[in-house]
A protein has these predicted regions:
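Structured, active/binding-site neighborhoods that engage oxygen-rich ligands
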Residues: 1-110
Length: 110
């Protein structure tokens, strides 16, 4: 496997992982592990072998809802992925001289 193929596979894995967890991100944060397990069980998503099935839930809406199995049309914007891309851009621009001011300006100019 070439270096380019490895980097591409790493990005695909990272984006796929973010999409896999996006539907239940708020459920797990607000309701904890038990709430997450209950949702996954009730939605028929366990054992987890694919993307999460859609089921009505007050915390499952917008982009999170669009990341459910059968509802995806594209990779939705994700703050974790945005941060990784921005971090790469900042390292390319500032290198080891990167400062907290550079980070603040980069976020504002994004």
């Amino acid at each position: 496997m070439t270096h380019e193929e490895r980097i591409r596979a790493a990005w695909q894995g990272r984006i796929s992982g973010c999409l896999l967890g996006k539907p239940v991100e708020m459920i797990s944060m607000r309701e904890g592990p038990q709430g997450l397990n209950t949702f996954l069980q009730d939605s028929g998503s366990l054992p987890l072998r694919n993307y999460v099935n859609y089921m009505e839930h007050e915390l499952l809406r917008g982009a999170n809802k669009r990341c459910c199995l059968g509802m995806m049309e594209r990779a939705e914007v994700d703050d974790d992925i945005t941060y990784l891309v921005l971090a790469l851009m900042m390292m390319e621009q500032y290198g080891l001289d990167l400062s907290t001011d550079d980070v603040a300006r980069s976020w504002i100019n994004l």
